[in-house]
Amino acid sequence: MRLIPLVTAEQVGKWAARHIVNRINAFKPTADRPFVLGLPTGGTPLTAYKALVEMHKAGQVSFKHVVTFNMDEYVGLPKEHPESYHSFMHRNFFDHVDIPAENINLLNGNAPDIDAECRRYEEKIRSYGKIHLFMGGVGNDGHIAFNEPASSLASRTRIKTLTHDTRVANSRFFDGDVDLVPKYALTVGVGTLLDAEEVMILVLGHQKALALQAAVEGNVNHMWTITCLQLHPKAVIVCDEPSTMELKVKTLKYFNELEAENIKGL
């Protein structure tokens, strides 16, 4: 596992965006051989999306031959709702780059048959072989996507009940009213995530410090979903300074020295 310890949220976003752009450009995607990118929502990736849009407008990357799969979507929230993840992605990323509409894949939280929708999503991912890079965030309790504590590490795309803590955390997007936050969501599974060629998780803020500590210094534990990254052959965590407050000094020193060349220029 790689840990990229940075100082600010803006630096985390810029590093993540630069990494994505480098991966896409090195892959040299075509219409017949697209680069497959997994994407998250929420507050954490906003700086990364902003940086990606800026790099696209500067001519440094094209998304014309990129296929995307989003991590999750609320159940029962109309896709036109401003807080649906469909709306979020278009508002913050898709509408500002050259990705074709047919290359965008989002779960349908209003599908008449939820189980069939989850199977369809998994089959669509498999039809491309694999996701080349899956970017994600992490919750205070270590959840990735909506794989809450005690999620199976072999799980696939499915419906999940959101914990009260997750709904409280997300209520900031619903005028602070937890009752407006949906109780259920569709989410890729931990197994789906681990199938990706590379997984990159962004960690911001002191509230995520215990989750980061579990991921880097703890044991694999289904109560901390983020620890699944220890099972992945190519996982990278990009974090800001406040999120590292629970890490041992020697752990942070080790990764700072190891990644010194990769941190330059931010």
From Swiss-Prot:
Keyword Hydrolase among UniProt keywords: yes
GO BP terms in the entry: carbohydrate metabolic process; glucosamine catabolic process; N-acetylglucosamine catabolic process; N-acetylneuraminate catabolic process
GO CC aspect terms: cytoplasm
Free-text activity regulation comment from the record: Allosterically activated by N-acetylglucosamine 6-phosphate (GlcNAc6P).
CDD domains linked: GlcN6P_deaminase
EC number: 3.5.99.6
Pfam families assigned to the protein according to its UniProt record, in alphabetical order: Glucosamine_iso (PF01182)
Broad class of enzyme this protein falls into: hydrolase
Pathway info: Amino-sugar metabolism; N-acetylneuraminate degradation; D-fructose 6-phosphate from N-acetylneuraminate: step 5/5
Site (Part of the allosteric site): S151, R158, K160, T161, Y254
Entry annotation: catalytic residues: D72 (proton acceptor), D141 (for ring-opening step), H143 (proton acceptor), E148 (for ring-opening step)
Keyword terms: Allosteric enzyme, Carbohydrate metabolism, Hydrolase
Source superkingdom: Bacteria
InterPro entries listed in its UniProt record: Glc/Gal-6P_isomerase (IPR006148), Glucosamine6P_isomerase (IPR004547), Glucosamine6P_isomerase_CS (IPR018321), NagB/RpiA_transferase-like (IPR037171)
Alphabetized GO MF terms: glucosamine-6-phosphate deaminase activity; identical protein binding
Catalytic activity: alpha-D-glucosamine 6-phosphate + H2O = beta-D-fructose 6-phosphate + NH4(+)
Similarity comment: family membership: Belongs to the glucosamine/galactosamine-6-phosphate isomerase family. NagB subfamily.
Function of the molecule: Catalyzes the reversible isomerization-deamination of glucosamine 6-phosphate (GlcN6P) to form fructose 6-phosphate (Fru6P) and ammonium ion.
Subunit structure: Homohexamer.
Xref: NCBIfam families: nagB, PRK00443.1-5
Protein name, entry field: Glucosamine-6-phosphate deaminase
Gene for this chain: nagB
